[in-house]
Amino acid sequence: SCTEKTCPGTETCCTTPQGEEGCCPYKEGVCCLDGIHCCPSGTVCDEDHRRCIQ
């Protein structure tokens, strides 16, 4: 699981299915199911097309 120290305050920590931690470049970002991609707050992940939609 992610801790506050994992990523800077301007980023969001995402955990991959393998349990690895990564940083999303958005503050309060939304992690996609793959744990690799992420979207800005207020959007959702389009898993099929790997993009963010409103």
From Swiss-Prot:
GO cellular component: extracellular region
Keyword Secreted: yes
UniProt keyword Disulfide bond, yes or no: yes
Keyword annotations from UniProtKB, A to Z: Disulfide bond, Neuropeptide, Secreted
Localization of this protein: Secreted
InterPro entries listed in its UniProt record: Granulin, Granulin_fam, Granulin_sf
Modifications the protein undergoes after translation, according to the UniProt entry: Six disulfide bonds are present.
UniProt record, GO biological process: neuropeptide signaling pathway
Tissue localization of expression: Brain.
Family, per entry: Belongs to the granulin family.
Descriptive protein name: Pars intercerebralis major peptide D1
Species whose genome carries this gene: Locusta migratoria
